[in-house]
Amino acid sequence: MRLVFAGTPAVALPSLRALLDSPRHQVVAVVTRPDRPAGRGRHQRSSPVRELADERGLEVLAPARASDPDFLARLGEIAPDCCPVVAYGALLPRPALDIPKHGWVNLHFSLLPAYRGAAPVQRAVLAGEDMTGASVFEIEPALDSGPVYGVLTERIRPTDTSGDLLDRLAVAGARLLEAVMDGIEDGTLQARPQPSDGVSLAPKLTVEDVRVDWSAPAAAVDRLVRAATPAPGAWTTFRDRRVKLGPVRPAPAGHPPLPSGRLAAPERGLVLVGTATTPVVLDEVRPEGKAPMPAADWIRGLRPGTDEAFA
């Protein structure tokens, strides 16, 4: 099939590469979000998908809005058979959805209808799920509600960050998306409606969502930190300054409890923080305006008092 691939961040690259290398399909163009300012210099930066498309000599469409008449006209001229999508990052209006013969087919990183929305992996880690997966479905105007062509499952490991899990799903999902493209071309694959029960939403994590509540149990603190890694990053405050947190882990067995948020002086190189249950070990921090550093080095420089705590 002649394909127009839509995607923006690095998580879309395994799928784009798989389709570019497929002997059965031809990616004739990509759709991605426009270049945007990034970094300290605020220089314009292309999306990872655009960078790969430029390397391969593909036509790039980067409309500010998918309803842009010039974009719709060009897409109509290309007349793709299908438009596979991975993390494009914008809603697609009905006029765009109607152009490809076989529609727009999206790789979504959850077992639909669970975790519809922008942050399915982060929300699954935050909720303490032990299993998730990916679904390939036909896009409809409603959010992530279209009929499903295929799914895969993936176990969530106890130490998985959202980044770890998303990396695995992106690779496995690329194989699934390619198989779905094959099945659509063969006419052997039928999309099935999503169940009406089990629907849940996965909105993007806000800055306030990832502020650590030290009065929560240690397991909840651990899930929050892992869910927010690598972005937006879990955080707390100390002496009225924001501190981003690296990974946490359970304190050694038998360690006495600490008041919620209380910092214990480094003990055998370990920085301990109190929660509602057992303390957690904090390995790395990123103080406001500074680079990441070992938590033990940071706390030695601050020398917190016995009554000081994260807030």
UniProtKB/Swiss-Prot annotation:
Annotated EC: 2.1.2.9
Sorted UniProt keywords: Protein biosynthesis, Transferase
Record field: transmembrane: none
Record-annotated disulphide pairs: none
Residues that bind (6S)-5,6,7,8-tetrahydrofolate: 110-113
Span list, region Disordered: 33-52
Reactions accelerated catalytically: L-methionyl-tRNA(fMet) + (6R)-10-formyltetrahydrofolate = N-formyl-L-methionyl-tRNA(fMet) + (6S)-5,6,7,8-tetrahydrofolate + H(+)
GO MF terms, alphabetically ordered: methionyl-tRNA formyltransferase activity
NCBIfam families reported in the protein's UniProt record: fmt
Its job: Attaches a formyl group to the free amino group of methionyl-tRNA(fMet). The formyl group appears to play a dual role in the initiator identity of N-formylmethionyl-tRNA by promoting its recognition by IF2 and preventing the misappropriation of this tRNA by the elongation apparatus.
Family: Belongs to the Fmt family.
UniProt name for this protein: Methionyl-tRNA formyltransferase
Organism: Parafrankia sp. (strain EAN1pec)
